[in-house]
Amino acid sequence: MKKDLSNIKKAKYLLDKNHCVAIPTETVYGLAANAYSDTAILKIFKLKKRPKSNPLIVHYCKAEDIKNDCELNSNFKKLYNKFCPGPLTFILKLKKNSKISKYVTNGKKTLAVRFPKNLETGKLLKSLNYPLAAPSANIYTQISPVSKKDVKDEFGKKISFILDGGSSKVGLESTIIDLVNKVKILRLGGIEIDKISKVLKRKLKYSKEKNKMQVPGQSKLHYSPNIPIRLNAKKPFPDEAFILIQKRKGFDKKYFYLTKNKNLKEAGKNLYSTLRKIKNLKFNKIAIEKIPNSGLGLTINDRLKRASKR
């Protein structure tokens, strides 16, 4: 317990000094900095090599903490009460007197907010008097990190500190919902659309509009191991690592499985770690069998399609 507290104090000290710190969340590890500080936020973009045109998600401890930055509405309250803390990001109207750095929003009048479900990061957020902007702790368009080791692999000693929270429990980024304009899903993520629709009592769909509001994780190439990926494969070619949805007997070392019994929640949790493992084993190509395109399978397929773009 004392070690945990000392780590949180160290993270707080560095964040107070406008440094970037990697933090654990239930989705993926984030590269965090003071969302009110231009200096700190610019360090995120530099470290990640991320375009400044791509807005950041801001992390808060609880709903009460966002009242100075955003305008709340009834849909937010319904979804917050059901899913938060958890893997859901809300697009809300930014208040004029908010202290949020202009670099977080790219000058937009909206803000993406989230309430992460992780014990260590929850304690850290409670100790701060500002929220944390925290995109995934990886180089832009690369595989998202789901452990402390993954972050080290990405950045080495370029990050001041990594707050260890074990492996991410969800392993997929948050679902993003727009609550400012017409209510719609802007990014598929760790909460299924059907579950959100049930709470709001309306049918929601994933918005694929070309000119929609820019949100994280929507570039054509993203979540990539920098290895060619062949989707919906029935069997691998000789030079390919092969990812299976379910564990089977009798396969050699170039076969990797996401689940033991086709559980899509487990498959989502293991997706990025499997891609990273294959990359670290120096395979030159990846084939993956067809993933069911329903529930969390929609999110998994979205990530794989973007990762396979060349």
Annotate the PLM regions.
Residues M1-R310:
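Active-site-adjacent structural elements in enzyme catalytic cores
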